[in-house]
């Protein structure tokens, strides 16, 4: 309606390697942000959006529907999944809906693409925040094993190959990131997160 002022739409990324707790934090942050701002937020988790589709495709490509880390997956499905994830986010942002996007996005973070508005396809009216959730490698591996997700089977069976893709951004090289150490006490982590996000 005329005269109603709308806040700039927010695009918040929760990134980090598998097992670090990014999805759990994002799901906890969303209702807290809604309560704090009165605004609507859409949760876009790559695994939720593309998990079943990727299972069907990888079952045909490799015979393993749970494969999410092998070279065939990385070659054929990784980029289309992220492209679809970002298209969905842009569609919601254009409608004035804030988006919380959850996915590893490690290549994109390393290359600073999440601050490249041309790559994101968003204008200056969108507020972009990037949270990088991290844990020590051994703790992340323990969490992955404990959660029992079949999609982690290739990762766990080929850990030495998988771990070569792991990287930890530094505050100096990636000042755009909120680096969140999820090995800290849970309430302290969440308080740090919400303070940084303005919730």
Mark where each language-model region is.
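Small-molecule kinase domains that catalyze NTP-dependent phosphoryl transfer to phosphate-bearing small molecules
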Residues: 142, 146-192
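Walker A/P-loop
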Residues: 23
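Glycine-rich phosphate-binding loop used to anchor ATP phosphates in small-molecule kinases
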Residues: 73-124
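Conserved phosphate-donor/acceptor-positioning beta-strand/loop module used by diverse small-molecule
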Residues: 123-144
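The conserved Walker
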Residues: 17-18
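Conserved substrate/cofactor phosphate-moiety recognition/catalytic segment
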Residues: 30-80
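Hydrophobic anchor at the beta1->P-loop junction of P-loop NTPases
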Residues: 14
């Amino acid at each position: 309606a005329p005269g109603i002022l709308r806040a700039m739409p927010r695009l918040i990324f929760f990134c980090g390697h598998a097992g670090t707790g990014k999805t759990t934090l994002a799901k906890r942050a969303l209702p807290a942000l809604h309560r704090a701002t009165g605004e609507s937020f859409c949760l876009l988790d790559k695994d939720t959006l593309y998990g079943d589709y990727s299972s069907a495709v990888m079952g045909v490509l490799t015979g393993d529907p749970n494969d999410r880390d092998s070279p065939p997956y990385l070659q054929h499905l990784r980029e289309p999944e992220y492209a679809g994830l970002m298209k969905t986010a842009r569609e919601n942002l254009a409608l004035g809906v804030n988006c919380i996007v959850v996915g590893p996005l490690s290549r994109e973070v390393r290359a600073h693409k999440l601050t490249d508005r041309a790559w994101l396809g968003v204008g200056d009216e969108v507020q972009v925040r990037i949270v990088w959730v991290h844990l020590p490698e051994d703790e992340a591996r323990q969490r992955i094993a404990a959660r029992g997700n079949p999609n982690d089977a290739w990762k766990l069976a080929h850990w030495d190959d998988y771990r070569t893709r792991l990287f930890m951004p530094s505050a100096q090289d990636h000042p755009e990131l909120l680096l969140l150490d999820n090995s800290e006490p849970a309430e302290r982590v969440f308080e740090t997160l919400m303070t940084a996000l303005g919730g």
